[in-house]
Amino acid sequence: MSERKIPKEVIEEVERLREEIEYHNYRYYVLNDPVITDEEYDRLMRRLIELERMYPELVTPDSPTQRVGGKVLEGFKTVKHSVPMLSLDNTYNEEEILEFDRRVKKALQEAEVEYVAELKIDGVSIALRYENGRFVLGATRGDGIEGEDVSENVKTVRSIPLRLRKPVTIEVRGEIYMPVDEFKRLNDEREEEGLPPFANPRNAAAGTLRQLNTALVAARRLDSFIYYVVHPENYGLKTQWEALQFLKELGFKVNPHSRLCKNIQEVIDYWKEWKERKRELDYWVDGVVVKVNRFDFQRILGETSKAPRWAIAFKFPAEQARTRVLDVTIQVGRTGVLTPVAELEPVQLAGTIVKRASLHNFEYIREKDIRIGDYVFVEKAGGIIPQIVKSIPELRTGNEKEIKPPDKCPVCGGKVGKLNPDEVAIRCLNPHCPAKLKRALRTLVSREALDIEGLGEKLIDRLVDAGLIKDIADIFYLTPFDLAQLGPGIGQRTIAKILQEIEEAKKRPLHKLITGLGIPMVGQKTAKILAEHFKSLEAIADASYETLKDIPGIGPEIAKSIVEYFRNPKTREIIEKLKKAGVKLEEKVVKLDILRGLTFAVTGTLKNFTREEIIEFLEKLGAKVVNSVSRNTDYLIVGENPGSKYERAKMLKVKMMSEEEFLEFVRKRAELKGYNFDEIMRSWKEWS
């Protein structure tokens, strides 16, 4: 049978679509500066998927459609690195970094040496090879001589280009990491599913890259920074700083905070700056990598068998504290998982007072040998979540008590157990446990979802305990009489305010409602993708697995979770109740261009907006919002008690405005473009 002939125009369209999609991936994932809407991007991707299905002969390893995952691998091949991937020597103090500088200058016989200071990303080292500009290999560091071929998983990392912007043959190196928000989402999800959480973002990224199911890797949204060119002399590069600019030109994501330092004192100043500013970032950093800038100097300095002599890791101080376990309480999650929580003697840690720490599950307690009364070391996983890293048995008095799993649910008294023998978590098996409903309600009314401030934790507990709410939709059927039954502390004015907030919540954007439903694996970002794509909750509920998995940003694992959620008859019943109550189940899309083309950052506390609200407001008016101030920032909005962004904006001469000046600025621009400013302020929260 002869091969069928593919029309020339189809081949040309496929190639054009791939180039266009990769360009928009670069704008979105690398530059964080998209130039088309998500809907337009989806349209391009759907067309490419359609053509590749019709003509599977045209599918290539570097096609954007290969990023979504779906393959199940048998294992990972071992590959030898072309040049060893060495580790770095570490230092934690200024004296040792000054000694490093003295050694470098002595060996080079130079009075001063230029350095490049780069943030040390807490992720997984990766080597990437390209032939004629096309991705051919992604390998882990391994033992430095040999690593594992994780190419299929690397393809799911959207900031890593599958085609370079120049047709070069090259090997580069960098770090694959898990963003802070994704790490928190993943651990919350794992605890709800009864799985052990990851200890830190680095472990999460490493564990994800070694998954055999590429769809699962795609669902976890890893990211990357590239910082090293192997054999830079082949490309006419003379310094590390030139190499970073070259990597940007090729289309790689390069950390924007790297700095060229004229001497070691500028390196120390950079280290001090980021020691204080690191929490502004959406990824975890544990120090600064200091590199001699000139490659000819690097060659003179050479390396030992383990580490280069021309670079060093200048680590930030470890953020750990010692405290004591006073007691252990048990929380019941939305899916019934029982999570032990350590009640601690209050201790200062990473800028906050820590009184509680998750113990994750009873297997974790057994492995760490943690007991009530123990002295323990506590740290913040990924700089966010307090957790106990080890107990100190040497300080035991003999009065400590072992922590044993409960034999019944601490809330409803129902049976507890595991859904399957391999599960780590213990769950409440009672489908009517009020604790599950309470957690689901807290998710629904949270600020990220329907934002019903009057329905706080205590009031939700009282409503459920009184039998006034049986499922999450019952919130929208509450009456003044229901609330009055709750007794003292709920006056007429409070009742009216709560009911008004509930009424306003019915008009929230669809993505807020989707977030509030608590669908496993669906956070705020995925909720926005679903709302923009389907435009109604009922359309999402009716969507097939095949339709969902092909949507960029969804993929097979999330698609499976969504289908299973809406397959439940109870979910359908809740949707029907929401509809009858007048909750908005369709998206009202409003996009304005009042601030289009402008980049804003925000610092301090504002009077009229929370941090989440001001970001949402700016984006709805067409602005781009960034986490840190750079020369590309147009305006910094300054509230009360501003942070380090204020000083940086002054240094860079970035324009600053108060909240009042900002609103006046918006008013004038709105009027120039023919919009009613007062109407915008009244209704912007209802837009999508």
Swiss-Prot record:
Keywords: DNA damage, DNA repair, DNA replication, Ligase, Magnesium, Manganese, Metal-binding, NAD, Zinc
A Pfam family that the UniProt record links to this protein: HHH_2
Residue ranges of every copy of the BRCT domain listed in the record: 590-679
UniProt-annotated binding residues for Zn(2+): 409, 412, 428, 433
Enzyme class, UniProt record, top EC level: ligase
Any GO CC annotation of this UniProt entry: cytosol
Residues that hold NAD(+) according to the record: 38-42, 87-88, 118, 141, 175, 291, 315
UniProt GO MF annotations: DNA binding; DNA ligase (NAD+) activity; metal ion binding
Active site: 120 (n6-amp-lysine intermediate)
Superkingdom assignment: Bacteria
Cofactor: Mg(2+); Mn(2+)
Catalytic activity reported: NAD(+) + (deoxyribonucleotide)n-3'-hydroxyl + 5'-phospho-(deoxyribonucleotide)m = (deoxyribonucleotide)n+m + AMP + beta-nicotinamide D-nucleotide
Alphabetized Gene3D superfamilies for the sequence: 5' to 3' exonuclease, C-terminal subdomain, 6.20.10.30, BRCT domain, DNA ligase/mRNA capping enzyme, Helix hairpin bin, Nucleic acid-binding proteins
GO biological process, one term: DNA replication
EC number: 6.5.1.2
Family matches, as PANTHER family: CHROMOSOME TRANSMISSION FIDELITY FACTOR 18, DNA LIGASE
Function statement: DNA ligase that catalyzes the formation of phosphodiester linkages between 5'-phosphoryl and 3'-hydroxyl groups in double-stranded DNA using NAD as a coenzyme and as the energy source for the reaction. It is essential for DNA replication and repair of damaged DNA.
Entry similarity comment: Belongs to the NAD-dependent DNA ligase family. LigA subfamily.
Protein name: DNA ligase
Organism of provenance: Thermotoga maritima (strain ATCC 43589 / DSM 3109 / JCM 10099 / NBRC 100826 / MSB8)
Gene expressing this chain: ligA
